[in-house]
């Protein structure tokens, strides 16, 4: 059983990198948020609106545990906040998984997120300064949890293929 867990801030490339890694390794990619949506039969936005964040974080933790305990191989892409709640950061250090923090700078994240702000409700109405401040605060708050990953891969000034290769080197 092989579990590869990718984590990092929104815009760091978790989904794109996981999809490419999946094609190369033939290990299925499971996006935690999509798994939660299928289970709840609601979008993440609807879960937050109808049940609140505490309920969502409980569902998220349960689904993460379920994916880790599955006998299937998987590349699991976490939501940006997943490691920060319900002691999920401790699960990143289990012996039976490989956890990788895709580390990006504030400028890299800003440049990636600014073009599709409308798809990200948290930042949709922010100007450049507000957005950079928001990202910086979140990165500061979350770095403790993100840094529990067994491996860190810098994504600044790296192509998707280069980042995937960095992860393949870790897995070798």
Curated annotation (Swiss-Prot):
Query: One cellular component GO annotation, for this chain's record?
Result: cytosol
Reaction(s) catalysed by this chain, per the record, are:
shikimate + ATP = 3-phosphoshikimate + ADP + H(+)
Classification via CDD domains: SK
Residues that bind substrate, according to the entry?
33, 57, 80, 142
The note on cofactor binding and number reads: Binds 1 Mg(2+) ion per subunit.
Q: Where is it localised?
A: Cytoplasm
Query: What are the cysteine partners in each disulfide bond?
Result: none
Binding sites annotated in the UniProt record for Mg(2+) = 15
Q: What cofactor does this chain's UniProt record say it requires?
A: Mg(2+)
One family from Pfam that matches here is SKI
A single GO molecular function term of this UniProt record? shikimate kinase activity
Q: Does the keyword Transferase apply?
A: yes
Q: What is its EC number?
A: 2.7.1.71
Give the pathway: Metabolic intermediate biosynthesis; chorismate biosynthesis; chorismate from D-erythrose 4-phosphate and phosphoenolpyruvate: step 5/7
Broad EC category: transferase
The UniProt family comment states: Belongs to the shikimate kinase family.
User: Cross-referenced HAMAP family, in alphabetical order?
Assistant: Shikimate_kinase
Subunit info?
Monomer.
Protein known as:
Shikimate kinase
**Which species is listed as the source?**
Flavobacterium johnsoniae (strain ATCC 17061 / DSM 2064 / JCM 8514 / BCRC 14874 / CCUG 350202 / NBRC 14942 / NCIMB 11054 / UW101)
Chain's gene name:
aroK
């Amino acid at each position: 059983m092989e579990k590869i867990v990718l984590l990092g801030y929104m815009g760091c490339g978790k989904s794109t990198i996981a999809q490419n890694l999946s094609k190369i390794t033939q290990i299925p990619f499971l996006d935690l948020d999509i798994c939660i949506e299928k289970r709840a039969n609601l979008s993440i936005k609807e879960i937050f609106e109808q049940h609140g964040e505490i309920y969502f974080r409980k569902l998220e933790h349960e689904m993460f545990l379920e994916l880790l305990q599955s006998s299937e191989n998987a590349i699991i892409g976490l939501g940006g906040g997943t490691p920060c709640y319900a002691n999920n950061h401790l699960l990143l250090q289990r012996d039976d998984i490989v956890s990788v923090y895709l580390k990006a700078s504030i400028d890299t994240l800003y440049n990636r997120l600014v073009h599709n702000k409308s798809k990200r409700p948290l930042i949709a109405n922010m100007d450049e300064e507000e957005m950079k401040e928001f990202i910086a605060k979140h990165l500061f708050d979350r770095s403790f949890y993100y840094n529990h990953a067994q491996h860190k891969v810098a994504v600044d000034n790296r192509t998707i293929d280069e980042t995937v290769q960095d992860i393949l080197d870790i897995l070798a």
